[in-house]
Amino acid sequence: MCGISGIASRRLRPDELRPVAERMARSLRHRGPDGTYVQCFSPPTTTECLALGHNRLAIIDVSEAGREPMSNEDGTLWLTFNGEIYNFREVRPRLEARGHRFCSRTDAEVIVHLYEEKGPDCVSELDGIFAFAILDLARNEIFLARDRIGVKPLFYAATHDSFLFGSEIKAILASSLIEPRMNRQAVSDFFTFLYVPCPETAFEGISQLPPAHTLQLRLHDHSFSIKRYWEVARDEGVEHCSYEQLKSEIRKRLAAAVERQLVSDVPLGVFLSGGVDSTVVAGLAKEAKADIQTYTLTLPGDEYRFYNEAVKGRAVSRHLGTQHCELPLEVPELDSILDLVEFSDQPFANPTSYLMYELSKKAREHITVALCGAGGDELFAGYPRSAAVRLARKLEAVPRPLVQFGGKALALLHDSHRNPRLRRARKFLRGLNSDFFVQYCHWTYFLSEGEKHKLLNGDLARQTDGNGLKPSAEILRSAFNQCSLSEPDNCVLEMDLKTFLADNVLEYTDRMSMATALEVRVPLLDCGFVELGLNVPFAYKIRHGRTKAVLFDAFSEFFPSEARNAPKRGFNAPLGQWVGRLFDDYFDIHGRRSGPVREKLGEDVGASWREGILDIGFIQQLRTEHHRGKSDRSHELFACMIFDVWWRKYIRKTQPLVHW
């Protein structure tokens, strides 16, 4: 994995180009500690000033021959690439047979020569996780592409005289050609989802290229077109397979994906929580590579037992025979959690990002590449909401007053942040009277449209009320309507894959691992396996009360007895226990000029509500509900804190950026 960046500008003179391109590349140096390189082009070679940047994390062919940006034989094509191409060993001989000359053993060089053969259609033959840019001097174009599922990120911005791109938003901001301004729609969506959905970003004028899309920039007029090149297709053959046939096919295809993703010239291991997905990946890795290492992040202390994965991880490792390493996590300081906003460059309030950062940082002392189990929940109905969809359908026959009575009874119970099950049950019952996508927002996400209208104050609130901003549930509706699978329940899973997985799980997986220069691979998101998994009949996914049933049964021998019936916990952080004690100080309405939060985070803590962006009255209401145990509001309050940090660092620019 690496970091990529680039610029095409009519505004810059040749002597101004290199300093800008170097600033952009240097901002991504955490993604590639093995070298930062910039290649510049200017008239008369080109019609305007162009530059490509690359930060290298060497994985395949670590020699200087793999250095990027790299070109084809005659220098008419130049590539900067982030990711891994898993089928490069199959593609390369075909290209060599057609006369292409290779100068390295890298997977990246295959892209250059495949583009020579196929042009933009080259992406259809690439199996991997990637984001790349090709400067095509002969066609006077820049071609951008992002992998099918969205494992690797790619952002871009276009002005009247410049086009910029990068693996992270910070590369674009580092150019100083884009003034950071808040995107109101994105901020509204953030307070629903706790992340910003693609293709929006929190900055006006900066977008994210969606997964499975390409972008062609025509340099003669800076016009560009975006095109989808892949979509999950319905597979009637899979739909009609028996349970036993599908177990066999799942095993065969996933084993092949894991074996392909074990290729590395540097140390490699597996993240192991002891859950179904990571256990399956670890078991297959062990079958293919006898000396596989596994790593588990542990949270010592009885108060964290709901979140601690140590016991299950240890049991699975012992059962599989892996070389196991437990990585204990200390209770973090608030500033260390909040400063992680700099790795996303926009509001992102899933506290699991901190766990991924610490796991990656600690594992990086031992390995450079890790395999993880991301994707299993979306493919095989592992989340509680997958069962909720079916339960809601059954409850349609239950009289509404009875359902409402159940909701009122749950409201009387004291809510504890130590166990999220009560919160889920309340949200489930609250959403039953709504349109399906509004229901799903209730079950899965956080602030409702009505609550956001109370929180988002001043100009932002007026925009949200009546000036063209869309309800966040429309993002889910749009993703669902693009699905072509035969079963509605599987379409919901695909919707999750396109939204929750791509914009949340893969966002923090990439940003937090690459912040430590660790490459994370995701075998369950091999595109062929994704197509298989989403087409498996839903009845095989939730079966006899077990979620992910067919996946578990396909690999049942990998699970020790103590892990077979353990409840799903997920990779979650004990947010309420970590930051609850600091809410009072952060949201102090009187603006005390002392206290641990202000000492570490700056005297302008709370600028976003003092300046009328957020409504402190509604925040106080959330605090009251939280303190009285009426409702666990730790995630919503944490989101307000994250937004305030982002606002001060990126929009007001009153707080320094500590990580870049």
Labelled PLM ranges:
Residues 304, 347-350, 397, 413:
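Alpha-helix capping and helix-loop boundary segments enriched in small/acidic/polar residues
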Residues 38-40, 153-156, 280-283, 379, ...:
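Generic hydrophobic alpha-helical membrane-span motif
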